[in-house]
Amino acid sequence: MKKQNLVSFSDNLEAMRKFSETYAKRTGTFFCADNSVTAVVIEGLARHKDKYGAPLCPCRHYEDKKAEISATYWNCPCVPMRERKECHCMLFLTPDNEFTSDLQEIDKTTLLEKIASS
């Protein structure tokens, strides 16, 4: 059973990595200059997707995560991101943000290395 959960998390991690890259390109946003921030946020999204079935924003505190997921407001991409390009997690940054990089991709190896070292 643990092996199945690890496979599921690995699949969700890759899905969230690909989603993040695609969404950044589609919205003209970029990842943080510190790619460990990008990695930790993608990991958090994958963990929530693995545990709850939805990529709930990992950067906020929730009294009831299941209720928040049902409300969908903080499911990534959250409403503030979709409406105003405001990402609380700093996963998707606008070009004028002082912490932005020119990157819209993070390779799988870098992602795994940054997660392992966090």
From Swiss-Prot:
Enzyme class label: oxidoreductase
Subcellular location: Plastid, Chloroplast
Cysteines engaged in disulfide bonds, as pairs: C59-C89
Keyword 4Fe-4S recorded: yes
Binding site for [4Fe-4S] cluster: C57, C76, C78, C87
GO cellular component, one term: chloroplast
UniProt cofactor note: Binds 1 [4Fe-4S] cluster.
Residues at the active site: C59
Cofactor requirements of the protein: [4Fe-4S] cluster
Catalysed transformations (reactions): [thioredoxin]-disulfide + 2 reduced [2Fe-2S]-[ferredoxin] + 2 H(+) = [thioredoxin]-dithiol + 2 oxidized [2Fe-2S]-[ferredoxin]
Function: Catalytic subunit of the ferredoxin-thioredoxin reductase (FTR), which catalyzes the two-electron reduction of thioredoxins by the electrons provided by reduced ferredoxin.
Assembly information from the UniProt record: Heterodimer of subunit A (variable subunit) and subunit B (catalytic subunit). Heterodimeric FTR forms a complex with ferredoxin and thioredoxin.
Family of this protein: Belongs to the ferredoxin thioredoxin reductase beta subunit family.
Stated name of the protein: Ferredoxin-thioredoxin reductase, catalytic chain
Organism: Porphyra purpurea (Red seaweed)
Underlying gene: ftrB
